[in-house]
């Protein structure tokens, strides 16, 4: 039997997440983009024979990161992925990130994720050693260490790494993926144009990491419509 995969569409309902460069026009927030991408990933995984457990399939807030992880554990998933997008007040911030459990030793699926994302975005380094604001090393080390209690400076709703840690503590390997910065015009444009390929790449990464061959569903061929009696061929010459 093929693996059971958990997909968490970040945020939802009253938890909006970050805004995008186009929020003022389309009214969409991170919660909308995570759900859209998660549903496409789910579809691709199901097409390849995998069972999928979703944290949500509509615009609802399914609970804290702890409750989301609990659902994955109750459904005994083999791997869980939390889908997010980044944002920052200065539009220059850009790139993708993949966060993994502190104790994870095998990074096969993560390396595949990076291979997909680097085709479209700059890969950000969470372990970079500097005082730069974007280097999350201190938080990353503390929050993803399964032996460390929850960092109390963060509330349940903002402790996004808590999904990874709580899955890990329940025996589930889980990743958190930040696709790109919705607040960066270039990232946003690239994502919108390539979201289906990105979703496919993520699904393919999971399928292949579990030792299966990814199968692309062939589009159904359209049956030519029979012409009605009064319709003429394009080359018909009227007399």
Describe these PLM feature segments.
Residues 2-3, 28, 32-239:
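Active-site-proximal helix/loop segments of hydrolytic enzymes
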Residues 2-27:
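Short glycine-rich His-centered loop
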């Amino acid at each position: 039997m093929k693996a059971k995969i958990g997909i968490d569409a970040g945020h939802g309902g009253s938890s909006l997440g970050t805004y995008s460069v186009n929020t003022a026009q389309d009214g969409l927030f991170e919660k909308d983009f995570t759900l859209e991408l998660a549903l496409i990933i789910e579809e691709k995984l199901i097409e390849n024979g995998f069972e999928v457990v979703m944290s949500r399939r509509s615009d609802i807030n399914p609970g804290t990161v702890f409750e989301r992880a609990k659902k994955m554990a109750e459904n005994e998933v083999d791997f869980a992925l939390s889908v997010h997008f980044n944002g920052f007040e200065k539009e220059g911030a850009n790139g993708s990130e993949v966060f993994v459990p502190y104790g994870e030793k095998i990074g096969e699926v993560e390396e595949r994720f990076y291979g997909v994302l680097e085709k479209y975005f700059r890969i950000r380094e969470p372990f970079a050693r500097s005082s730069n604001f974007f280097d999350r090393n201190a938080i990353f080390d503390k929050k993803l260490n399964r032996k460390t209690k929850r960092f109390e400076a963060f509330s349940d709703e903002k402790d996004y790494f808590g999904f990874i840690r709580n899955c890990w503590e329940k025996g589930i390997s889980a990743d958190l993926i930040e696709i790109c910065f919705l607040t960066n015009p270039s990232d946003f444009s690239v994502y919108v144009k390539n979201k289906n390929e990105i979703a496919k790449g993520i699904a393919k990464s999971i399928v292949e990491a579990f030792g299966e061959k990814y199968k692309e569903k062939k589009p159904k061929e359209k049956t030519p419509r029979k012409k009605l009696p009064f319709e003429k061929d394009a080359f018909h010459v009227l007399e």
